[in-house]
Amino acid sequence: MNLEQIYKDCGAYLQGHFLLSSGKHSEFYLQSAKVLEDPKLAGKLCDELAKIIASYDIKFDSICSPALGGILAGYELARACNKRFIFTERVEGVMNLRRGFEVKKGEKFIVCEDIITTGGSALESAKIIESLGGEVVGFAALANRGFCAVKNLNNPRKENAKLPENLPLFALGNFEFEIYEANVCPLCEKGTKAIKPGSRGN
């Protein structure tokens, strides 16, 4: 499966000057919503991701995603795995579990995102689950932006990765783009302004 080509065909592989949810800048941005707007394609991708997870014999009960970007990917993965799905969301900048969702003591979760960059939002969701007595046994994403180590792709972990080293991350593909601190961004030096295409409200 050529994930890069799928993103390009869907108009989801963007080039420009982007402000990421981390506050860093990049010349490229992956807009997974453009991929996931097609239910058949979303189902196909998450069916493939479910097969990868199953091949590692990971035992889990439910899937949780951080809103907003992870919801479609997480829901489709839950369908493919025949598991329960819940999501966390930010309230005044703080990740919470709302809407009557519950976590049972000892319930095992995979946290699913559309894109994992450093893994910050996924880690926030994992901490919520663990604080309520659940157990996170792994992470999943359609795509990894190259910082976190992916179990099935054998890519190395980089310095900025936030996901725990002892838990696996599964993804369909890796995208490695240069990411810059705002104060040393070569795109800013050329006089262009970073735009924020993402979903996190900050």
Curated annotation (Swiss-Prot):
Binding site for orotate: 117, 145
InterPro entries reported for this sequence: OPRT, Orotate_PRibTrfase_bac, PRibTrfase_dom, PRTase-like
EC code(s) of this entry: 2.4.2.10
Residues given in the record as 5-phospho-alpha-D-ribose 1-diphosphate binding sites: 113-121
Pfam families for this protein: Pribosyltran (PF00156)
Gene3D superfamilies cross-referenced by the UniProt entry: 3.40.50.2020
Entry keywords, A to Z: Glycosyltransferase, Magnesium, Pyrimidine biosynthesis, Transferase
A GO molecular function held by the record: magnesium ion binding
PROSITE patterns: PUR_PYR_PR_TRANSFER
Gene Ontology process terms (BP): 'de novo' UMP biosynthetic process; pyrimidine nucleobase biosynthetic process
Named cofactor requirement(s): Mg(2+)
Biological or metabolic pathway of the protein: Pyrimidine metabolism; UMP biosynthesis via de novo pathway; UMP from orotate: step 1/2
Reactions performed catalytically: orotidine 5'-phosphate + diphosphate = orotate + 5-phospho-alpha-D-ribose 1-diphosphate
PANTHER family: OROTATE PHOSPHORIBOSYLTRANSFERASE (PTHR19278), URIDINE 5'-MONOPHOSPHATE SYNTHASE (PTHR19278:SF9)
Stated role: Catalyzes the transfer of a ribosyl phosphate group from 5-phosphoribose 1-diphosphate to orotate, leading to the formation of orotidine monophosphate (OMP).
Family: Belongs to the purine/pyrimidine phosphoribosyltransferase family. PyrE subfamily.
Self-association state and partner proteins as the record states: Homodimer.
Name by which UniProt lists this protein: Orotate phosphoribosyltransferase
Organism: Campylobacter lari (strain RM2100 / D67 / ATCC BAA-1060)
Gene (UniProt): pyrE
